[in-house]
UniProtKB/Swiss-Prot annotation:
It comes from the Eukaryota. InterPro entries: Aquaporin-like (IPR023271), MIP (IPR000425), MIP/Aquaporin (IPR050363), MIP_CS (IPR022357). The lineage of its organism: Eukaryota, Fungi, Dikarya, Basidiomycota, Agaricomycotina. A motif (NPA 2) lies at residues 241-243. Residues 1-50, 111-128, 205-213, 289-312 are cytoplasmic. It is found in: Membrane. Induction: Highly expressed 15 degrees Celsius. The expression is comparable or even higher below 15 degrees Celsius, but transcript abundances decline at elevated temperatures. Pfam families: MIP. SUPFAM superfamilies: Aquaporin-like. It catalyses: H2O(in) = H2O(out); glycerol(in) = glycerol(out); NH4(+)(in) = NH4(+)(out). Aquaporins contain two tandem repeats each containing three membrane-spanning domains and a pore-forming loop with the signature motif Asn-Pro-Ala (NPA). Its main location: membrane. One of its GO terms (cellular component) is plasma membrane. This is Aquaporin Lacbi1:391485.
């Protein structure tokens, strides 16, 4: 049986600088460094890129949440500054900009669920995973902290004082499901949205499918996140990214909201915005690999590949 897997199929998770249209620098960063700083920073560039990418994602996304919701209070603004579409645009732009910044350096994961799926199914080095996830989580905390400082006075007005913090404004930073949703329904919603996310990401990176032209991956992600928010976002706030929820949630716990942000619905935070995206990304990847992917790193494509059937 002939091998139908081509060498030019996408070999792993990391999108190369060439895929983003970057030109090589005048010197090779991997072998020659013009000064000590360039040499010292090299081992950390990928992790810093993930940190900054997630921080930018949160600044745009949580910033949009804060501006739209807080401005609805007449004590903050004379008229509302946006609507649900504004929220979705904020998250879509944040995702696109975060990937634009980090894509040519780290691959632009900016999502622990994506990182883990790429490790399991695309050959992403396992030893990089803890550092990537830590950087992503830290980026979520720092990004949320910057937005909190920016909007602290408006939050004070809405809450009624500096030392009053409730889930009403905690929901600007992390996701809290609608009251009518059961935890099982919330889990399914996050699972489904993340599975859709990862399937499109794999299709976008699959050279045997229909990848976007060089440099346009962030634009595809913009429409992807905008679409997920418009279709699946109302009930849970579509975390679809553990770092997007857990990082800001930890920030709120540190700035005065306390344990209530973790006690909501008996540890809702761990099942729906964390575990569900991780599982959704795994199942979405399995689905894509089973039915579409033809790259050499497709685990299902290698099963039984050593068996050759001779014609009768």
């Amino acid at each position: 049986m002939d091998d139908k897997f081509d060498d030019d199929a996408l070999p792993n998770s990391k999108t190369t600088p060439e895929d983003y249209g970057d030109k090589l620098a005048e010197y090779d960063y991997t072998n020659t460094f013009p000064n000590t700083w360039m040499r010292l920073r090299e081992p950390f560039r990928e992790y810093i890129a993930e940190f900054v990418g997630v921080a930018v994602l949160i600044i745009f996304g949580v910033g949009a949440d804060c501006q739209v919701v807080l401005s609805a209070n007449t004590g903050v603004a004379p008229s509302p500054k946006g609507d649900y579409l504004s929220l979705n645009c904020g998250w879509a732009i944040g995702t696109a900009m975060g990937v634009w910044i980090s894509g040519g350096i780290s691959g632009g994961h900016i999502n622990p669920a994506v990182t883990l799926a790429l490790m399991a199914w695309r050959g992403f080095p396992w030893w990089k995973v803890p550092g990537f996830i830590f950087a992503q989580l830290l980026g979520g905390i720092v990004g949320a902290g910057l937005v909190y400082v920016n909007y602290i006075h408006a939050i004070d007005i809405v809450e009624g004082g500096r030392h009053i913090r409730t889930l009403d404004t905690a929901g600007l930073f992390a996701t809290y499901a609608a009251d009518y949703m059961t935890n099982v329904s919330c889990f399914f919603s996050e699972f489904l949205a993340t599975a859709v996310l990862i399937v499109v990401i794999h299709a976008m990176n699959d050279k045997r499918n229909a990848p976007p032209p060089a440099g346009l991956a962030p634009l595809v992600l913009f429409f992807l996140i905008l679409g997920i928010g418009a279709s699946l976002g109302m009930e849970t706030g579509y975390a679809i990214n553990p770092a997007r929820d857990l990082g800001p949630r930890m920030l709120t716990a540190m700035v005065g909201y306390g344990r209530q942000v973790f006690a909501f619905r008996n540890q809702y935070w761990i099942w729906c915005p964390v575990i569900a995206p991780f599982l959704g990304a795994q199942v979405g990847t399995i689905f894509y690999d089973l039915f579409f992917y033809k790259g050499q790193d497709n685990v299902f494509g290698r099963l039984g590949s050593h068996i050759h059937i001779s014609p009768a």
